[in-house]
UniProtKB/Swiss-Prot annotation:
Note: In plants, chitin acts as a microbe-associated molecular pattern (MAMP) that is recognized by lysin motif (LysM)-containing plant cell surface-localized pattern recognition receptors (PRRs) that activate a plethora of downstream immune responses.
Keyword vocabulary terms for this entry: Chitin-binding, Glycoprotein, Signal, Virulence
Region of interest called Disordered, as start-end residue ranges on this chain: 148-203
Domain topic, free-text comment: The LysM (lysin motif) domains are small globular domains involved in binding chitin in eukaryotes. LysM3 contains one LysM domain.
Gene null: resulting phenotype: Exhibited slightly lower rate of radial growth.
Gene3D superfamilies: LysM domain
GO molecular function: chitin binding
Biased composition regions of type Polar residues, renumbered to the chain: 159-180
Induction context: Highly expressed during the infection and development of decay of apple fruit. Does not affect lesion development on apples.
Recorded name of the encoding gene: LysM3
One Pfam entry name: LysM14_C
Organism the protein comes from: Penicillium expansum (Blue mold rot fungus)
List of glycosylated residues: 173, 193
Protein name: Secreted LysM effector LysM3
UniProt function note: Might have a role in sequestration of chitin oligosaccharides (breakdown products of fungal cell walls that are released during invasion and act as triggers of host immunity) to dampen host defense.
Length: 316
């Protein structure tokens, strides 16, 4: 009986040890243990599943790209669950600026990360990797505090009131000149034909100037419409979100078939659009892309989903 109790206690201790997750450790080359944030993740759940604390997560990610703290986690982001060098952020197929442009290599100095692939002068790089001048681009709440601050010009101004004033002033001067020119007309000795010619000439100049000023169109202002994030799904050829991948994003169901299912090889548009569905096939570690029709991958092994829901079904 005593032996049975000892064996039972040993089994219980073994199960308890197995149930307690071992804390993640850095890789052999000094990088932190990388974790991909999933839907509905919280720091509390992540910490419990990996045998660490929320304070550990905050500490490990002080230098992680776009880290805003445990209160603001973004699905699909890479974070650290151990000490070590932070990972490069996930490449975004539609990115044209910042470190998430596909093919961007890790900088020798991590402090230079935010300045990689900069926008043209006077434009800001938004956290989703595109350039613009409106507040949604320039109030980049996800850029690390140490990153460079973009210099932004104000919105295009409407025609200044000075131009209007000059027009009025010009008109006033001409009125004065007209009045001054009309003084000789009050002289009975002046010839009527001379007066008529002068009045006509002044009137013509005034009308021409006024008409030209009135037709000047105001400069177009920058649209302030809010940016709407599309749903995105990235399907990888290997486990752990590695290898070649499909990247799809969209706003509506215009390109879905009658069964409500996306056809990866159904001629989906490969150019970015703000209204439809886009599909690209990325190869060579994200350096090159082609249409999804050119891929032969039929069974993706892992995926990342943003701004949407995913359901998996088993079938024969």
């Amino acid at each position: 009986m005593g032996l049975f109790r000892i064996d039972f206690l040993a089994l219980w201790l073994l199960l308890l040890r197995l149930a307690t997750a071992a804390a993640p450790v850095p890789t052999k080359d000094g990088f932190c243990f990388k974790y991909i944030i999933q839907g509905y993740d919280t720091c509390a759940l992540i910490a419990k599943a990996h045998g660490i604390t929320e304070a550990d997560i905050e500490s490990f990610n002080k230098n992680t790209w776009a880290w805003l703290g445990c209160g603001r986690l973004y699905q699909g982001d890479f974070i650290c669950l151990s000490t070590g060098k932070p990972p490069m952020p996930m490449a975004l197929p539609q990115a044209t600026c910042g470190p998430q442009v596909p093919g961007t290599t890790r900088p020798a100095n991590w402090a230079n990360l935010a300045g990689m692939n900069p926008c043209a002068e006077s434009k800001c790089c938004a956290f989703w990797g595109q350039c613009g001048v409106t507040d949604i681009y320039c109030q980049n709440c996800r850029a690390p505090p140490a990153g460079p601050t973009a210099t932004v010009k104000g919105a295009t101004e409407a025609p200044k009131s000075q131009t209007s004033s000059n027009t009025k002033a010009g008109g006033a001067n001409q009125s004065v000149n007209t009045a001054a020119g009309s003084k000789p007309t009050s002289n009975p000795n002046s010839k009527s034909n001379t007066t008529t010619v002068k009045a006509t000439k002044i009137t013509t100049i005034t009308k021409s100037s006024t008409t030209t000023k009135a037709k000047a169109a105001p400069e177009p202002s920058v649209s302030q419409s809010p940016w709407t994030a599309p749903w995105e799904i990235t399907l990888y050829s290997k486990m752990g979100c590695e290898g070649d991948y499909y990247h799809l994003e969209g706003y509506n169901k215009e390109f879905l078939d009658n069964k409500g299912c996306l056809n990866l090889h159904g001629g989906l548009n490969s150019k970015f659009t703000e209204t439809g569905v886009t599909c690209k096939w990325w190869t060579d570690d994200g350096f090159t892309w082609s249409s999804c029709d050119s891929s032969k991958l039929m069974k993706p092994q892992s995926w990342i989903l943003k701004n949407g829901y995913c359901s998996a079904f088993m079938f024969d």
